UniProtKB/Swiss-Prot annotation:
It comes from Arabidopsis thaliana. Belongs to the PPR family. PCMP-H subfamily. PPR repeats lie at residues 79-113, 114-148, 149-179, 180-210, 211-245, 246-280, 281-311, 312-346, 347-382, 383-413. The gene is PCMP-H61. One of its GO terms (cellular component) is chloroplast. One of its GO terms (biological process) is chloroplast RNA modification. Keywords: Repeat. The lineage of its organism: Eukaryota, Viridiplantae, Streptophyta, Embryophyta, Tracheophyta. This is Pentatricopeptide repeat-containing protein At5g66520.
Length: 620
């Protein structure tokens, strides 16, 4: 845009200025508009000043708000509206503390307050989790007679709740004779942000009339708290109410489906979007791609991607991440190259996705080339996540010495995830000496993670150092660290069934156990011998280890799926941990014996089992 070419004749000076502002996207253009406003006297016009500052504050450009501050500082006596405008602008920015600094200047200037001054200040306090400043502003509200102003009180409730002072938040809420929707939503939002979902739900149930914000706040809270089953249950309640789901609630419901692997429910929401003609914004598009990818349907994910008219870097990244989950490294790299041909610059998350894809498929040279291109070609500094991807890439490929050297030479301090990737590789490739060394480092820097002790003990046991394995196990107990239990889920007819390793709580457990005994006989007839290597930590005899391995959660979930679905139906399983060798072996055999496709998502990736083979090629 050539701002200079805009006509600034006195007759339509204001109109042309506002028109140029709407087309402004760069700071240089903004400066030219400001210069013209100074030259033509528009900076003396209160309407023009307000429009100029409002534009700067609402702009997505990070340069415009600081420039608005420079312009504002040039005024001798800004009125209350302009003070409030600037305070509001910084309260929503990456520097909310500047709202509080502006307020200090406002107090010194003797500019009068009004009811709109305090909500923005309290928003800044909430973003900073600043309890002391909240109490000071509370005192000002009381002193100036705004203690009964609904906007000020609602903002106070939210700020106290967000800063963890629920007693004060509830006290203020209880003092309101007739709380409005904003009052209810403020206190609920505070509890949600603090992760106190039980209290938030109690308050939510007490609301006489719930609006879209109320429902969305609760649903998104459950998703953020990783309570995805509860999120979907509440979303179904919302559908049965008289409140229409908005884009945010739909996006959160789809996110819950993705985490649970609830494909049918995710498809229903997608169908609902199409029927109601809800505008497919970039957020919904990305969440849909992610949902289909995480539910094992990459073809559907690709179809959604193709139908997005304006593909953002987030959409490309979601698709590349999907290919990574499924072990389609070549496809991920292909899309990574294609997005750049389309003029889309990859970001740090895109690089994490494509490097993960390389790691999961053993594309060592390709992964290294992409990693080293980050800073050289894209001016992006690799983060700890990117270094972790390379360690995992080298470790999976058996290049343990190179992985160790890479860690020692990396400019960032290696964390537990970095060392953990190398320890896992030592276990896979049976490098006992290096594994014992890394195990010591890991427990020293991450003493409260059960997996660190388990891997270290198993490394000792692989070398038949039973005393050291027992010592590691004893240390784990002394620290009060528990091993995370294996948990698998299967979604059937809108209900998610959960199984723990050795679980007997399911109402149909007897039927499951009976079916498993039949399946086990068929497995043995087809040459199945249990893989007990990964059971070494338990230090029990072979019979006990075999009994334990047969009760792994994914076996229970698959068995239940065979009972409850028709022949030929795809069985979809979610697992919270990496699938063990025995379960992987068993699932391959089940897919062949029962002629079923089985899609299993474990902690890191997808496994598609068909005709006795797995899509991972036994590389996981």
């Amino acid at each position: 845009m050539n701002v200079i070419s805009c006509s600034f004749s006195l007759e339509h000076n204001l109109y042309e200025t506002m028109s140029c502002l709407q087309r402004c996207s760069k700071q240089e253009e903004l400066k030219q508009i400001h210069a013209r406003m100074l030259k033509t006297g528009l900076m003396q016009d209160s309407y023009a000043i307000t429009k100029f500052l409002s534009f700067c504050i609402s702009s997505t450009s990070s340069d415009f708000l600081p420039y608005a501050q420079i312009v504002f500082d040039g005024f001798d006596r800004p009125d209350t509206f302009l003070w409030n405008l600037m305070i509001r602008g910084f309260s929503c920015s990456d520097e909310p503390e500047r709202s509080l600094l502006l307020y200090q200047r406002m107090l010194c200037s003797s500019a009068p307050h009004n009811a709109y001054t305090f909500p923005s200040l309290l928003k800044a306090c909430s973003n900073l989790s600043a309890f002391e400043e909240t109490t000071q502003i509370h005192a000002q509200i009381t002193k100036l007679g705004y203690e009964n102003d609904v906007y000020a009180v609602n903002s106070l409730i939210n700020s106290y709740a967000v800063t963890g002072n629920f007693k004060l938040a509830h006290l203020l809420f209880d003092r309101i004779p007739e709380p409005d929707d904003v009052s209810w939503n403020s206190v609920i939002k505070g509890y949600v942000k603090a992760g106190k979902m039980d209290i938030a739900l109690t308050l939510f149930r007490k609301m006489a009339e719930k609006n879209a914000i109320s429902w969305t706040t609760m649903i998104s809270g459950y998703v953020q708290a990783d309570m995805n089953k509860e999120a979907l249950q509440l979303f179904h309640e919302m559908q049965n109410s008289d409140v229409e789901p908005d884009n945010v609630s739909l996006a959160n419901a789809l996110s819950a489906c993705a985490q649970l692997g609830a494909l049918e429910q995710g498809k229903w929401i997608h169908s609902y979007l199409n029927k109601t003609r809800i505008r497919m914004d970039s957020v919904l598009g990305c969440v849909l791609i992610d949902m289909y990818a995480k539910c094992g349907e990459m073809e559907e994910a690709l179809e959604v991607f193709k139908n997005i008219k304006k593909k953002s870097v987030q959409a490309w990244t979601a698709l590349i991440s999907g290919y990574a989950y499924h072990g389609h490294g070549r496809e991920a790299i292909s899309k990574f190259m294609e997005m750049q041909k389309m003029g889309i610059k990859p970001n740090v998350i895109t690089f994490t996705a494509v490097l993960t894809a390389c790691s999961y498929t053993g594309l060592v040279e390709e992964g290294k080339l992409i990693f080293y291109s980050m800073e050289r070609d894209y001016n992006l500094k690799p983060t700890i996540e990117h270094y972790g991807c390379i360690v995992d890439l080298l470790g999976r490929a058996g290049l343990l010495d190179e992985a160790k050297r890479f860690i020692q030479e990396m400019p960032l301090k290696p964390n537990a995830v970095i060392w953990g990737a190398l320890l896992k590789a030592c276990r896979i490739h049976k490098n006992i000496e290096l594994g014992e060394e890394i195990g010591e480092i890991l427990i020293a820097i991450d003493p409260y993670h059960g997996g660190r002790y388990v891997h270290k003990a198993n490394i000792h046991a692989m070398d038949k150092k039973w005393d050291k394995a027992a010592e590691t196990r004893r240390l784990m107990k002394e620290q009060g660290v528990a091993k995370v239990p294996g948990c698998s889920t299967i979604s059937l007819e809108g209900t998610t069934h959960e199984f723990l390793a050795g679980d007997r709580s399911h109402p149909e457990i007897e039927k499951i156990q009976s079916k498993w005994r039949i399946m086990r006989r068929k497995l043995e007839e087809n040459g199945y011998v249990p893989e007990l290597e990964e059971m070494l930590l338990d230090l029990v005899d072979d019979d006990e280890r075999e009994a334990i391995v047969h009760q792994h959660s994914e076996k229970l979930a698959i068995t239940y799926g065979l009972i409850k679905t028709k022949p030929g139906t795809i069985i979809r399983i979610m697992k919270n941990l990496r699938v063990c060798k025995d379960c992987h072996k068993v699932t391959k055999l089940i897919s062949k014996i029962y002629k079923r496709d089985i899609v299993m998502r474990d902690r890191t990736r997808f496994h598609h089992f068909r005709d006795g083979k797995c899509s991972c090629g036994d590389y996981w």
